Amino acid sequence: MSDTAERVKKIVIEHLGVEESKVTESASFIDDLGADSLDTVELVMAFEEEFGIEIPDDAAEKILTVKDAIDFINQKTAA
C-alpha cells in the first residue's frame, strides 16, 4: 500500500472511529463506514491539512470512497 493510502486510511480510522479492517479502498465513507455529511466535510479538511492541498467543493462531492480520496490526492500531489 502506498504512503498516501496509508495516511488516508489512518485519517479515516481516526475521524470515523472505525476498525482498520473496514477501511478498504472500495469502502464508501457513508454506506460502509457510517459517515454522515459533516463527517465527510471533516475528512476532506483533514486530507487538505495532512497533504497540504486544496480540495474544491465540486471535487469533494465526488470523493465517495477511500480509493476516490487516494486517487485525488495522488493526482494533486503529483502535479
Swiss-Prot record:
Listed PANTHER family: ACYL CARRIER PROTEIN, CARRIER DOMAIN-CONTAINING PROTEIN
Keyword list, A-Z: Cytoplasm, Fatty acid biosynthesis, Fatty acid metabolism, Lipid biosynthesis, Lipid metabolism, Phosphopantetheine, Phosphoprotein
Gene: acpP
GO cellular-component term (any): cytosol
Keyword Lipid metabolism applies: yes
Domain (Carrier) ranges: 2-77
Protein name: Acyl carrier protein
Pathway annotation from the record: Lipid metabolism; fatty acid biosynthesis
Residue pairs linked by disulfide bridges in the UniProt entry: none
Post-translational modification: 4'-phosphopantetheine is transferred from CoA to a specific serine of apo-ACP by AcpS. This modification is essential for activity because fatty acids are bound in thioester linkage to the sulfhydryl of the prosthetic group.
